[in-house]
Amino acid sequence: MDSTKNHNTITLPVIIVTPAIKIQTRSLCFYYRRQQVLRDVCLELPANQITAITGPSGSGKSTFLTVLNRLWEEVEGCSISGKVTMELGGQMKDIYSRGLPAPELRRKVGMVFQQPNPLPMSIYKNIAFPLRLAHQKNKELIREKVESTLKQVYLWDEVKDRLKEDGRLLSGGQQQRLCLARALVLDPEILLLDEPTSSLDPEASSGIEELLLSLKKQCTLIMVSHYHDQTQRISDLQFRVSNGRFRLQET
C-alpha cells in the first residue's frame, strides 16, 4: 500500500493595495496677471502619504499649494482654469464649487508656511484661536484640545508651564511646532507645508521630519521642499516642477 499522500499546492492571489486618491487635478492652469504659472497640471495624489514637490524658485511649487486651499483668491490679478477635486468627509468634492465656501475648505485643508508665524498672543491662545473662529464655545473642550494638540507635536512638556507667554518668544523649532499645532487643532484631512524646515537648524528640522511621518496616520501631507535629502527620507511620492509643469520622480 502506497503511503505517499498527494499534497495539493494552493496558490493564493496576489492582492495589490492601491492607496485611495485624496486630491485630483485635471488640466489645471494658473495665471498671475499675464503670466502663466501652472500649465495643464493633471495629478492624482494618494491619501495618508507624504507627497513632496521640488523644483527651482519661481517654478510654481508654492502657487500649487495656494490653489489647493484657495489662498490665492486673496491676491488681485490671479485666475485659474481646470478642475481640482478632493475627497473630503468621504465624498469627492470640486473645491471651487459654489457649495464649498473657502473658510469651510480651509478647516479641512490646513497650511504651514516657510517662516514660523505665531500670532501675537499667548501660546495657549495661538492654538485656541482657530477653535473659536470655528464657533467652539465650550471652554473645557477647548482646553482639552489645546493640550492634546500640543502633545501631538511634542511641545506640551516644553510649554505646559508657559502657556500664558507670548508664542513669539519660543525658539524657531518650537514656533514651527506651535504653527503645526495650530493647523492640526481643527483635525484637517489635508496638510499643506511650504518648506516647513528651511528656517530651522538641523536638530529642529529632524524633529519636524519625525513629526510629519507620524502625521500620515491621520491626514494627507503635501510638502514643498528644496532639500533633496529630506524628500528622499520622508516622502512617498515626489514631483519636480519646471516652468509650471509637474514631472513624477523616482523615489
Predicted region positions:
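Helical segment within the ABC ATPase nucleotide-binding domain
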Residues: 205-217
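Conserved ABC ATPase "signature" region
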Residues: 85-90, 94, 140-160, 213
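The feature captures the beta-strand-to-loop junction immediately N-terminal to the Walker
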Residues: 54-56
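Conserved catalytic motifs of ABC-family nucleotide-binding domains
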Residues: 187
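ABC ATPase NBD Q-loop/coupling interface
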Residues: 83-104, 164
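Conserved ABC ATPase signature
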Residues: 164-170, 174
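Catalytic Walker B motif of ABC-type/P-loop ATPase nucleotide-binding domains
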Residues: 191-194
